[in-house]
Amino acid sequence: MGCDRNCGLITGAVIGAVLAVFGGILMPVGDLLIEKTIKREVVLEEGTIAFKNWVKTGTTVYRQFWIFDVQNPEEVAKNSSKIKVKQRGPYTYRVRYLAKENITQDPKDSTVSFVQPNGAIFEPSLSVGTENDNFTVLNLAVAAAPHIYTNSFVQGVLNSLIKKSKSSMFQTRSLKELLWGYKDPFLSLVPYPISTTVGVFYPYNNTVDGVYKVFNGKDNISKVAIIDTYKGKRNLSYWESYCDMINGTDAASFPPFVEKSQTLRFFSSDICRSIYAVFESEVNLKGIPVYRFVLPANAFASPLQNPDNHCFCTEKVISNNCTSYGVLDIGKCKEGKPVYISLPHFLHASPDVSEPIEGLNPNEDEHRTYLDVEPITGFTLQFAKRLQVNILVKPARKIEALKNLKRPYIVPILWLNETGTIGDEKAEMFRNQVTGKIKLLGLVEMVLLGVGVVMFVAFMISYCACRSKNGK
């Protein structure tokens, strides 16, 4: 009887030890299985989970616009007063709803090339008004004229055309005209062939972005989705030195197994440069743990604050010898037009940039850019891209509409908020196929290890107690 009891206790202890060992072994084996599965499914080729969602995003993406309506146009034009603006919006469009086109795999270098069609559909139910709402804004053509044509004689000729067309420093335009284009009366009088259509995003609809060529991850998963070339080049030809390089992905996804310590680099054709985001916090998105990466203030800092930005300073006058910060001159990318990009309401911009403008209220939560990245797969499941489009206007002696200005202004035209969040159905699928399985595997590992250890310890204690009792 004593032997049977002792044998049973030893058997229980052995079973517990086996369970504990199996649970311990399952941890690295399970991690290897997860890693192998993830590496297979994030490759950008036909048949993988990543490829299906990469070709056409399953996320509804909206682009909201807020227009800066100028309240005192005559006062500014006559007296060079501060520009008073009133933000109006949002006006919402659905974008990025078209699938990638001309998708071509190249097995020689493990890349896939494509173009991304552009399109925008107005969403009245998500907007405060219609596309026909009017705004008083800077006259884009008049403001750009002295930048593109610096010769004083040519400016004199342009001045006569501006007067003849009854154009001035400011104009009234509908939302649709301002965003997507209108025939400019001044440019229509220019006696040689030029484009007479002007718009902040003209041309956009029925155009494509690319060609992009990205690594598909087939031979090296750590390079998946990273851009190899854009429009056939590895450099942009807009900036000096390393600032001109095309770095990272397009921000829709990143190589898997993202760490908090990483700097996520991505290229944005909207701002004509590569940029980066850093880890801020952990976020629970519809039951999925994600890492929130944010665009740091340092990305738009002056070279004095961040020496790495020295090659983004392209001129010395407006930038106060490269000491101003928070704005980026992308004129070279826009055919010489004086376009400046910033965060909305000049968030993180130097006082000399925002001082001439009244009515701005920068807010970190509303105006910053962030990416919510699922760290195991590297997929961006939620994002908010926020940026502001500004036009530089400065005094021009030969152009009467601008001759009364006493200083240059970087005038905010509009700011946009492009957002996308994984849908409920996609989130459930993601939980079931990825995070749910990983949690279940982790739970099984811990249960086996925990139960095994408890059984082993309990049975061994009982066995020792029995032996001690029998010995007496």
Curated annotation (Swiss-Prot):
Extracellular side: 30-439
A GO MF label: transforming growth factor beta binding
Protein family according to the UniProt entry: Belongs to the CD36 family.
Annotated site residue numbers, Critical for TLR4-TLR6 dimerization and signaling: 463
InterPro entries given in the database record: CD36/SCARB1/SNMP1 (IPR005428), CD36_fam (IPR002159)
Subcellular locations according to the entry: Cell membrane; Membrane raft; Golgi apparatus; Apical cell membrane
Disulfide cysteine pairs (residue numbers): 243-311, 272-333, 313-322
Assigned keywords, A-Z: Cell adhesion, Cell membrane, Disulfide bond, Glycoprotein, Golgi apparatus, Isopeptide bond, Lipid transport, Lipoprotein, Membrane, Palmitate, Receptor, Transmembrane, Transmembrane helix, Transport, Ubl conjugation
Gene Ontology CC annotations of this record: apical part of cell; apical plasma membrane; brush border membrane; caveola; cell periphery; cell surface; external side of plasma membrane; Golgi apparatus
Protein name per UniProt: Platelet glycoprotein 4
Topological domain ranges for the Cytoplasmic compartment: 2-7, 462-472
Organism: Rattus norvegicus
Cross-link entry Glycyl lysine isopeptide (Lys-Gly) (interchain with G-Cter in ubiquitin), positions: 469, 472
Entry PTM: Palmitoylated by ZDHHC5. Palmitoylation is required for proper localization at the plasma membrane. Ubiquitinated at Lys-469 and Lys-472. Ubiquitination is induced by fatty acids such as oleic acid and leads to degradation by the proteasome. Ubiquitination and degradation are inhibited by insulin which blocks the effect of fatty acids.
Interaction with PTK2, PXN and LYN: region residues: 460-472
Name of one Pfam family that matches: CD36
Region described as Required for interaction with thrombospondins, THBS1 and THBS2: spans on this chain: 93-120
Positions annotated as glycosylated: 79, 102, 134, 205, 220, 235, 247, 321, 417
Chemical reaction(s) catalysed: butanoate(out) = butanoate(in); (9Z)-octadecenoate(out) = (9Z)-octadecenoate(in); (9Z,12Z)-octadecadienoate(out) = (9Z,12Z)-octadecadienoate(in); tetradecanoate(out) = tetradecanoate(in)
